[in-house]
Structures are given as C-alpha cells and as structure tokens.
C-alpha cells in the first residue's frame, strides 16, 4: 500500500512536470519544473522509451578508451536502438551535444537524437547513443567557457572508439559497417573521430566507415598540428548564420582536406542557425560564453527547410557508405 502511494505521487509529479515543460535546445529552462528523471528511475524505465514511435532502446554499458578515476577504463552509458531484424545490422554511433543526452526538461533522451535514431532505424541501421557526461558526473557544459570544461574533444574521441569497439564485438552488428553522427559538441567529436592523426585512432586499430558532423565546432581541428587528415568519408552539415559554432573554420578544414583528395564534404544551409534540426523556434541564448557575439548570446533553433534537406543528405550519405 505504501509503495503504491509513493508511485502514485511520483506519477503525479511526473505528469505535472510534463505539462510545465517546454522542449528547448540545449536544456535551457524557461519555466521552473520538477524533472521527470525521478519517475523514470523509480519505475525502472529507460529514458528513451517514453518517446513516440514505439522506440524501445536497450540500455547498455561499455568501456571508453579513456580512464576513470580509479585508473581503469571508464565505463560509458549507451542507449541502443535497433530495428527488427534476424540478420546482423550496420550501425551508427551517435554523440550528443553540450547539454548531454538526456533533456533536463523531460528526463528523456532529447528529441533531436531520437528523431535521428528513428530515421536511421527506418533505414535498417542500429543506433547507439553514447552518454559521455553522466559517467563523468557532468550534466552540461554549454554554459562553461571552453578553457574550463572538464570534458573536451579528446574525451569524445576516446568515447567514440570505445563505442566502435563495442559495436564491432556484437554478433548482431556487421563489423566494419559502423558509422558515426554527432551534434554540435558531439559533431566535433564525430568529425575528430575521422582524423587519422589522433591517438585514439592509432590505439583502437579500428575505423569508422563514415561520419556526419552536424553543426560542429571546427576551430581547433582547423588549427591543430599535425593537420587534421580524414581517413574516410566525412560529411559536415552547417548553418550559414550559426553564431555559436561558425561555419568558416569548417570551410577552411574542408577545403584543405579536399586539396589532399580526402573525402570531406561541407554543406551549408542558407539562413540556418545552430541546431537547425530542432523543433524549437529560433531564440537567443545569453548564457553561452563561447559564441562569436560575446555577451550578446547565440541564436539556436529550427529551420524546417534546412532540417529536411539535412535529413535527406544524411540518408543518402549513409546509404552510400553503409549500404541498405
């Protein structure tokens, strides 16, 4: 009886919170609310399962190439979405942005990620969403200056290769047919995962078949020494008006790579800001210290035309390099 009352109270809190929640990019609060994470934790529900479309992710764990506080390999959290199939599947590793995999507003996997997972599942690919933050005790880094962040690009690269090794070891995944896709900070990780000069690539002994970087920050990669060198197909999708992760460093990187005949493609969507694939209207975030406008903030939000064009290009790209 007591447990029933507790669960009833949790349910009331959860559904009340849902009514107050507004799904915005980057986990920014527009109203005070009680997180739905408590309800999920008590009910034992994987945070992606409440999303529409019948998607039921398997919660998995696997080692990163990074070390944990104990000195051993850091164990990562992941959410594996798989279409029904009796045959092994190609797969795509997905990397979240600076707000993490789980929305602070809903307690669920952010809709941009589940929407992309659904698109890729419909193509016949398994999708592994990697949570790089929760295992490190970090909720978000959007509001943290670049120099002060505890999680940097090198951590995302090591997580990427941990995920790649994990998927290649599974009998239900086609080894060697694993791609990557990332958004914003995770887009930088996906981009860097294709860099043949990184330590993680050399240590892993494995390759991603192809990668998509959605509105990544390319500044560090465009300046690094030794120079970024793509070992496989890389597609960068960017917004023309992005003032959080501007397109010009990505253009520099792409042109330089193409001059070396490396398979790097850059697509720039006119009029699009950061996170153009979201469903939220464009608004200004003034709590972000890393954009090009200083204290004036950055623009984030949907551009429906760019979103649909990007989805189409992602389908074409992975069909070409992963099959199906």
Locations of regions flagged by a protein language model:
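Primarily recognizes the serine-hydrolase "nucleophile elbow" in alpha/beta-hydrolase
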Residues: 151-230
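Short beta-strand/loop motif that positions the catalytic acidic residue
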Residues: 236-238
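Acidic catalytic loop of the alpha/beta-hydrolase fold
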Residues: 241-245, 275
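C-terminal catalytic histidine-bearing segment of alpha/beta-hydrolase fold enzymes
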Residues: 263-324
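N-terminal cap/lid segment of alpha/beta-hydrolase-fold proteins
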Residues: 53-86
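Serine-hydrolase catalytic machinery in alpha/beta-hydrolase-like enzymes
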Residues: 75-76, 88-169, 280-281, 286-300
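N-terminal secretory signal peptides that target proteins for export/translocation
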Residues: 1-30
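Short alpha-helix in the alpha/beta-hydrolase fold that links the catalytic acid
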Residues: 247-256
């Amino acid at each position: 009886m007591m447990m029933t009352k507790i669960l009833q109270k949790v349910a009331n809190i959860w559904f009340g919170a849902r009514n107050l929640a507004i799904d915005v990019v980057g986990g920014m609060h527009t109203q005070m609310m009680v997180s739905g994470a408590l309800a999920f934790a008590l009910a034992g529900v994987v945070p992606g399962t409440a999303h529409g479309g019948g998607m039921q992710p398997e919660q998995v764990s696997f080692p990163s190439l990074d070390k944990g506080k104990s000195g051993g390999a850091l164990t990562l959290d992941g959410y594996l979405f798989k279409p029904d199939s009796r045959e092994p599947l190609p797969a795509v590793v997905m990397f979240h942005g600076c707000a993490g995999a789980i929305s602070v507003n809903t307690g669920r996997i952010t809709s941009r990620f589940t929407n992309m997972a659904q698109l890729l599942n419909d193509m016949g690919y398994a999708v592994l969403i990697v949570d790089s933050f929760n295992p490190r005790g970090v909720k978000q880094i959007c509001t943290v200056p670049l120099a002060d962040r505890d999680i940097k690009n090198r951590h995302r690269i090591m997580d990427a290769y941990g995920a790649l090794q994990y998927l290649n070891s599974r009998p239900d995944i086609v080894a060697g047919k694993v791609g990557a896709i990332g958004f914003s900070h995770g887009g930088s990780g996906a981009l860097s995962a294709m860099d043949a000069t990184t330590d993680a690539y050399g240590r892993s002994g494995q390759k991603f078949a192809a990668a998509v970087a959605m509105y990544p920050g390319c500044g560090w990669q465009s300046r690094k020494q030794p120079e970024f060198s793509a070992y496989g197909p890389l597609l960068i999708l960017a917004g023309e008006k992005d003032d959080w992760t501007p397109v010009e460093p990505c253009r520099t990187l792409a042109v330089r790579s193409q001059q070396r005949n490396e398979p790097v493609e850059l697509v720039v969507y006119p009029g699009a800001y950061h996170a153009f694939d979201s469903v939220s209207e464009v608004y200004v975030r003034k709590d972000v210290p890393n954009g090009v406008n200083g204290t004036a903030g950055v623009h984030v939000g949907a551009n429906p035309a760019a979103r649909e064009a990007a989805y189409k290009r992602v389908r074409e790209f992975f069909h070409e390099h992963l099959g199906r």
